[in-house]
From Swiss-Prot:
HAMAP family assigned: SecA (MF_01382)
GO biological process: intracellular protein transmembrane transport; protein import; protein targeting; protein transport by the Sec complex
NCBIfam families on file: PRK09200.1 (NF006630), PRK12904.1 (NF009538), secA (TIGR00963)
Compartment(s) where it occurs, according to its Swiss-Prot or TrEMBL record: Cell inner membrane; Cytoplasm
First-tier enzyme category under EC: translocase
Protein name: Protein translocase subunit SecA
Keyword Cytoplasm: yes
Gene: secA
Gene Ontology molecular functions: ATP binding; metal ion binding; protein-exporting ATPase activity
Cofactor note: May bind 1 zinc ion per subunit.
EC number, as in UniProt: 7.4.2.8
Function of the molecule: Part of the Sec protein translocase complex. Interacts with the SecYEG preprotein conducting channel. Has a central role in coupling the hydrolysis of ATP to the transfer of proteins into and across the cell membrane, serving as an ATP-driven molecular motor driving the stepwise translocation of polypeptide chains across the membrane.
Residues the record lists as binding Zn(2+): C834, C836, C845, C846
GO terms under cellular component: cell envelope Sec protein transport complex; cytosol; plasma membrane
């Protein structure tokens, strides 16, 4: 109550932010009279002037009014589009590193040019991030005309480009691309062996278009580069063949809210019987239990044409939020293989992680981050907590006149769909275009069949018809057009009204259910009523919808029964609307908790990744790593001396045989120490004794190999050992995370346990790196002078081939999966035939050189 009164007196926080910006907008407008009379050459010269002023120490903040005025005039001359005042406000919000919520049709793409131009003047690079290649290419080429005019370099990153093209694109002042391409390029760069091969040049400023889709919806999806694990796929088919025996409630239970399925005791017993196992819960049977659980998920939780489609003998994931297919993406942890077995298509090998990062941690690397979307306010708390981004609601240039009608609720789905088709037919008869929003492919096809029977012409846009997406959406505002779109497919493309449609009432939105998130519902509504156009929307619901069935109250159904309502009789009631909104809030809160929880775990992994990648970068950047090698040697020597000296005993009784054996393992040396040498010595003396032997061995080796060759060998071995052990460490971390939840049963905090054990694993990784690098270095021999060059040349050639193969396999477009099923990109397996054509296994051929 008091909060509402204060808001009335002082205005909301959003109002205060906008009020602070207005004087800046006035200054930009005042400069128009100075900028407008300039000739083209004088306007272009402003870019050079701005760069010189920055070089002399002037800040971007000081340049903002004049640079915005220059960009506005340039856009007007080149594109014939002048930035509105609200777009100036949006540009200022973005420059300040905030999220601008701008309604559909308000010109987000044009707005972004203002901060992009200003920040591009610094020469440090600006990344404009979009959700798919089509939008990246479209926006880059469209706005690139203005950047060209002003003398700014720009480029785009799209799927299929090679490293030379990517390096050139990142070197530009302004780079457009998708979140996937930026993220995968970061991972690929950190798998390379030369700094000159890196594509990216830093993380200065990023503007994320459709920021809610990328930073919220896809936050649960790590980007992963992976290689095939060395295991058979036969077990997937064997497990799949017995799944028909398992019955719900008797053998397994389903929690639809948590989206989990669990075996009962009877289910475990049935599994033991069918798989001929004595104890399915025994550690020796852990693989069979894991496969059985994944097969249950595949059969019970994942639906064909909802969660995935089968296309050309492949299981292809369907994005939950956009309805787009994600070619090349695979669920992890054996789930994708279980789906392949379920659908009776070829079961591919499982994957092992080689490099991974979440979008949350990737985008937090930028010095400044900003975003644009039509729907962010419902997730403002999450943006602030996770990314420290404030959301500012932008006023529309024209008043919003769309009519959002009350929800209509039916007892069952059949009645709901009949009502939907009736409304579409009525609107079509009037000539009004209709956009029908569905949550899955099967619903879109059901509505399409019903419309065909009703003789209403229509277009269907879902994962099966994604190729014509932009074309279908662009035409959706024409007279009498009916378009069925799954999960906001076509987002990013404006629906412009055809001739005469405004007079008919504009675009009408019909939604066949509510999404779990209010934000997705608002996105669908926002397709109508752009830039002051008329329009309307209505949501059709039934008590059988998943949202109401799983999260809603059973009281709603009871009320409808007591009222004696007929099947085709709808109800509109405030209590039901509140129940729906409460259900959505529950789901949003639940999903936020999941993302926050996952980030807490990923932050542990992220710290380790930063350390390894930074050390790797320093090795690549330095010509000489001998100081690091010497430090490793000193640590190993110190540990050896500590292990084999025991000052409670006479030094002659120490384990000298064990010490000599370990010296042979670690340094490939076998000193012959006399009894006199071993008499009455202490820890420090043993340490110096070992250090002397090792130093002598190292000097001899350096003399034999030559100093330059030795430095080259040190770098090669250090990088190869780090990369190999990092891959194994990622696998260990995957196993740790998978089982850590069980610690809760032992009254321990799983997150604290994960942090503790992850720290131990990382410590072990660092020690193993030291021992393997030093051991390998002490054993290597150069027979011919050009051996190292030949080894380096072969390694570089093979590495380039692998990176090209990874590049070719990285999928284009959008990406999103459940949080436990990341995206993968394949790499050569150790046991697969070597790509050089020798006929040998990869690990026995070119793999040895890596």
């Amino acid at each position: 109550m008091i909060g509402k009164m204060l808001t009335k007196v002082f205005g909301s926080k959003n109002d205060r932010v906008l009020k602070q910006i207005r004087p800046l907008v006035t200054r930009i407008n005042d400069l128009e009279s100075t900028i407008k009379p300039l000739g083209d050459a004088a306007l272009v010269a402003k870019t050079v002037e701005f760069k010189e002023r920055i070089a002399k120490g002037e800040s971007l903040k000081d340049l903002l009014p004049e640079s915005f005025a220059v960009m506005r005039e340039a856009a007007s001359r080149v594109l014939g589009e002048r930035h509105y005042d609200v777009q100036l406000v949006g540009g200022i919000i973005l420059h300040k590193g905030r999220i601008a919520e701008m309604k559909t049709g308000e010109g987000k793409t044009l707005t972004s040019t203002l901060p992009v131009y200003l920040n591009g003047l610094s020469g440090k690079g600006v990344h404009v991030v979009t959700v798919n290649d089509y939008l990246a290419a479209r926006d880059a080429e469209w706005m690139g005309q203005v950047y060209d005019f002003l003398g700014m370099s720009w480029d785009k990153i799209i799927h299929g480009m090679d490293d030379v093209e990517r390096r050139a694109a990142y070197a530009a002042d302004i780079t457009y691309g998708t979140n996937n391409e930026f993220g995968f390029d970061y991972l690929r760069d950190n798998m390379k062996f030369e700094l000159d091969d890196f594509c990216q040049r830093g993380f200065n400023f990023a503007i994320v278009d459709e920021v809610d889709s990328i930073l919220i919806d896809e936050a649960r999806t790590p980007l992963i580069i992976s290689g095939p694990a060395e295991m058979s796929t036969e077990l997937y088919d064997n497990i799949n063949s017995i799944m028909y025996n398992f019955k719900v409630e008797e053998h397994y239970t389903v929690d639809e809210k948590a989206r989990t399925v669990s075996l009962t005791d009877d289910g475990i017993g049935l599994g033991e019987e069918l798989l001929d196992l004595e104890n399915l819960c025994d550690p020796s049977s852990i693989e069979q239990l894991h496969h059985l659980n994944q097969a249950l998920k595949a059969h019970v939780l994942f639906q064909r044409d909802v969660d995935y489609i089968v296309n050309d003998g492949q299981v292809v994931i369907v994005d939950e939020f956009t309805g787009r297919t994600m070619e090349g993406r695979r669920y992890s942890d054996g789930l994708h293989q279980a789906l392949e077995a379920k659908e009776n298509v070829k079961v591919e090998q499982e994957n092992q992680t080689l490099a991974a990062i979440t979008f949350q941690n990737y985008f937090r690397m930028y010095d400044k981050l900003a975003g644009m979307t039509g729907t962010a306010d419902t997730e403002a708390a999450e943006f602030k907590k996770i990314y420290d981004l404030d959301v500012v609601l932008m006023p529309t240039n024209q008043p919003m006149v769309r009519d959002d009608y009350a929800d209509v609720i039916f007892k069952n789905e059949d009645a709901k769909y009949r009502a939907v088709v009736r409304e579409i037919a009525e609107m079509h008869e009037k000539g009004r275009p209709v956009l029908v929003g569905t949550i899955s492919i099967d619903v879109s096809e059901k509505i399409a069949d019903m419309l065909t029977k009703a003789k209403v012409p229509h277009e269907v846009l879902n994962a099966k018809q994604h190729a014509r997406e932009a074309e279908i959406i662009t035409a959706a505002g024409q007279v009498g057009r009916v378009t069925i779109a799954t999960n906001m497919a076509g987002r990013g493309t404006d629906i412009k009204l055809g001739e005469g449609v405004r007079e008919l009432g504009g675009l009408h939105i019909v939604a066949t259910s509510r999404h779990e998130s209010r934000r997705i519902d608002n996105q669908l509504r926002g397709r109508a009523g752009r830039q002051g156009d008329p329009g309307s929307s209505r949501f059709y619901l039934s008590l059988e919808d998943d949202l109401l069935r799983i999260f809603g109250s059973g009281r709603v159904s009871g009320i409808m029964d007591k009222l004696g309502m007929e099947e085709d009789e709808p109800i509109e009631h405030g209590m039901i609307s509140r129940a729906i909104e409460n259900a959505q809030r529950k789901v949003e809160g639940h999903n936020f908790d999941i993302r926050k929880h996952l980030l807490e775990y990923d932050d542990v992994m992220n710290k380790q990744r930063e350390i390894v990648y930074q050390q790797r970068y320093e090795v690549l950047a330095g010509a000489d790593v001998s100081a690091e090698i010497q430090e490793m040697v000193n640590d190993i020597v110190r540990n050896l001396a500590s292990e084999f000296s025991d000052e409670r005993l006479d030094s002659l009784d120490w384990d000298w045989a064990g010490c000599l054996e370990r010296l042979q393992e670690a340094f490939s040396v076998q000193p012959e120490w006399s009894e006199e040498t071993r008499t009455d010595i202490k820890f420090e003396e043993l340490r110096d004794l070992i250090a002397g032997v090792v130093a002598q061995k190292y000097r001899e080796q350096e003399e034999e190999n030559g100093a330059d060759t030795q430095r080259q060998l040190e770098k090669i071995l250090l990088l190869q050992v780090v990369d190999g052990l990092w891959k194994d460490h990622l696998l260990s971390m995957d196993y740790l995370k998978e089982g850590i939840g069980l610690r809760g049963y032992g009254q321990k905090n799983p997150l604290n346990e994960y942090k503790r054990e992850a720290f131990q694993l990382f410590g072990h990784l660092m020690e193993t790196v030291k021992s393997q690098v030093v051991s390998s270095l002490m054993r290597v021999r150069v027979v011919h002078e050009n051996d190292v060059d030949r080894m380096e040349e072969e390694r570089r050639r093979r590495h380039e081939e692998e990176m090209q193969r990874i590049q070719a396999l990285v999928p284009a477009g959008n990406a999103d999966e459940e949080h436990q099923q990341p995206a993968h990109v394949d790499k050569i397996g150790r046991n697969t035939p070597c790509p050089c054509g020798s006929g040998k296994k990869y690990k026995k051929c070119c793999g040895k050189l890596s």
